[in-house]
Amino acid sequence: MIDQYKHQQLQIGLVSPQQIKAWANKNLPNGEVVGEVTRPSTFHYKTDKPEKDGLFCERIFGPIKSGICACGNSRASGAENEDERFCQKCGVEFVDSRIRRYQMGYIKLACPVTHVWYLKGLPSYIANLLDKPLKKLEGLVYGDFSFARPSTKKPTFLRLRGLFEEEIASCNHSISPFFSTPGFATFRNREIATGAGAIREQLADLDLRIIIENSLVEWKELEDEGYSGDEWEDRKRRIRKVFLIRRMQLAKHFIQTNVEPEWMVLCLLPVLPPELRPIVYRSGDKVVTSDINELYKRVIRRNNNLAYLLKRSELAPADLVMCQEKLVQEAVDTLLDSGSRGQPTRDGHNKVYKSLSDVIEGKEGRFRETLLGKRVDYSGRSVIVVGPSLSLHQCGLPLEIAIKLFQLFVIRDLITKRATSNVRIAKRKIWEKEPIVWEILQEVMRGHPVLLNRAPTLHRLGIQAFQPTLVEGRTISLHPLVCKGFNADFDGDQMAVHLPLSLEAQAEARLLMFSHMNLLSPAIGDPICVPTQDMLIGLYVLTIGKRRGICANRYNSCRNYPNLKVNYNNNNNSKYRKDKEPHFSSSYDALGAYRQKLISLDSPLWLRWNLDQRVIGSREVPIEVQYESLGTYHEIYAHYLIMGNRKKEIRSIYIRTTLGHISFYREIEEAIQGFSQAYSYTT
């Protein structure tokens, strides 16, 4: 379909019977209206021409050959004379044969039929709106039981039966024959509702706004009750609250989309264009046909049988009519979803029929096979690798992909900045990879997000926005924390990169799709950007340290030389390397020693720490207290060391740690400070 902005789009939803007729009906010059498929036949066995009013009728779906009618007459398609658009003899329109790819027909059902997607789907929309159990609705649809229509203006047989139960008991011998008389048809049509018609009546009587109001009132009452202490009652109350929320959302959606609930029950069944369900003739008189045609034939045959019985309702038993209605319902269910009734329907060769749902869904379905996965402009594709130096909202684009994606923007800026005079020279500069090209490319990329997508896109986190940066090589660099949303890993997975062009698309990418704004799962609300796999192993290796314990070095290693740089490469100090643990006054000194290869990531060391009240006020008992000749002392604990003067004042604190712990702590501290600055800026 085409919207008001002339954008082509595909929309799946409910339509009214009037819209289905409008898709199919055509008015012939003689006043006849064609569009209804009434016969299950396809092609004539002698002439191999489509049967009139059949599933391949040329009057309904258009000519097989462009500009040639069923009679063999021809006329140039698109001629100006409207009186000659249709053949006066056969009624076929002189148009291009491609019309058979989109011209639809319809089957007028003799009884209403529920749409199986909305009845048996999870959740069941029909059961949700009617607030009734699904099993009861299924029993009503398939004729297992009926219900009495409410009637307030006049007494009915069913109502009087409750008032005169004793009198009726004495007349049982005369009441039973009544149900086999012609008068029962009138009684049934007036007072008894069964099948999908009963569902349609109930849906038509619904007031969606009242449903929303009543559901909201009931939800508030359940919310005010709180917990009763009974686990079973609390569970039922919780399930009921979830159901009420879902019911309100569904009713609101029907109101917003201008869809009537009774449209979930079909009175007209659309017939697909014949080119989408072809019949192919092969050598040796072999015919290959789509399963959809066979399912349509079954629907038409059963529907015609039901229409015949309804015309002779005075002679047809009520049970036979109800049984035929059930057969029509099952035939339509099989057409829409073959496995909806449990075991899928099979043909004479024990092969499962492929229904409309089977044609649409899955990897080989119409959408993913034909419509999706095609090449589009301003896009690229490459293998993803880990980018540990990237921020959460960044991705690394190879130079080749970046220059191809942003080529038009680079050409525009080259001409605007008078670095070149025309497009041809600008393309030559790009091809020759001049330095000014990379400068402009980085400037363009700085303000333009890109979209990364990994197939299959099963939820909205399968495509996210990132700020691109240039990287060497031919792979896309990705922050490891965003992999869970994409369900990606770095074992050869590929991702596609797309460039949003319009200002609306760029604004949506920045406001809604950036990776740092999608930290929680949209389904359950749990954090989705959490360390996994390689990150956990790296953090473990970084912070494991050497678990030799403080007692291995008599607690006081190098205490007299706080900033001593130990030469581990000197063989004479091998004993010193084993026993002595260096002291550092700051983390920068420790990092400097690591860069000089004096210590390793997991080597224990003593780091001077700020006076911390948590340490000072701790009730932990020191392992050992050492006093020196000048009156100073050292209180040695399991993981820290307190140095004091002769006045019992704490002079400094050293903690026992490793360089891996220091690096991890600094990263967390910088992240918290950056978050605090960003939060204060936004507020």
Swiss-Prot record:
The keyword Nucleotidyltransferase applies. Binds 1 Mg(2+) ion per subunit. Binds 1 Zn(2+) ion per subunit. InterPro entries: DNA-dir_RpoC_beta_prime, RNA_pol_asu, RNA_pol_N, RNA_pol_Rpb1_1, RNA_pol_Rpb1_3_sf, RNA_pol_Rpb1_clamp_domain, RNApol_RpoC1. One of its GO terms (biological process) is DNA-templated transcription. Its cofactor is Mg(2+); Zn(2+). Zn(2+) binds at residues 69, 71, 87, 90. Keywords: Chloroplast, DNA-directed RNA polymerase, Magnesium, Metal-binding, Nucleotidyltransferase, Plastid, Transcription, Transferase, Zinc. It is found in: Plastid, Chloroplast. Its EC number is 2.7.7.6. It comes from the Eukaryota. One of its GO terms (molecular function) is magnesium ion binding. It is an enzyme of class 2 (transferase). Pfam families: RNA_pol_Rpb1_1, RNA_pol_Rpb1_2. Signal peptide: none annotated. One of its GO terms (cellular component) is mitochondrion. It catalyses: RNA(n) + a ribonucleoside 5'-triphosphate = RNA(n+1) + diphosphate. The keyword Transcription applies. Mg(2+) binds at residues 489, 491, 493. Belongs to the RNA polymerase beta' chain family. RpoC1 subfamily. In plastids the minimal PEP RNA polymerase catalytic core is composed of four subunits: alpha, beta, beta', and beta''. When a (nuclear-encoded) sigma factor is associated with the core the holoenzyme is formed, which can initiate transcription. DNA-dependent RNA polymerase catalyzes the transcription of DNA into RNA using the four ribonucleoside triphosphates as substrates. HAMAP family: RNApol_bact_RpoC1. This is DNA-directed RNA polymerase subunit beta'. It comes from Triticum aestivum (Wheat). The gene is rpoC1.
